[in-house]
């Protein structure tokens, strides 16, 4: 880890059930899929869905648009 980078104490862990308390997805709930303690963010299942444009590859020659969860700040979620 880089020097000078401070880990934030995150009050939730992976597989915890949380509810979003602020932002566009306020009121939604889901399971924590991943925690980023250095950034103080968490990825919650079904929350903060964004579309990603994937470039063409050999397996999908036309490319595709996929929807996936993006991180939300840990202060915007609560357990329960």
Swiss-Prot record:
Gene: rplX
Residue ranges of coiled coil: none
Pfam (any one): ribosomal_L24
Role of this protein: One of two assembly initiator proteins, it binds directly to the 5'-end of the 23S rRNA, where it nucleates assembly of the 50S subunit. One of the proteins that surrounds the polypeptide exit tunnel on the outside of the subunit.
Recorded family membership: Belongs to the universal ribosomal protein uL24 family.
Gene Ontology biological process terms in this record: translation
Protein name per the record: Large ribosomal subunit protein uL24
GO molecular function: rRNA binding; structural constituent of ribosome
SMART domains, per database record: KOW
Subunit structure: Part of the 50S ribosomal subunit.
Entries under PANTHER family matching the protein: MITOCHONDRIAL RIBOSOMAL PROTEIN L24
Taxonomy, superkingdom: Bacteria
Record flagged with keyword Ribonucleoprotein: yes
InterPro entries: KOW, Rib_uL2_dom2, Ribosomal_uL24, Ribosomal_uL24_CS, Ribosomal_uL24_KOW, Translation_prot_SH3-like_sf
UniProt keyword terms in alphabetical order: Ribonucleoprotein, Ribosomal protein, RNA-binding, rRNA-binding
Biological classification of the source: Bacteria, Pseudomonadati, Chlorobiota, Chlorobiia, Chlorobiales
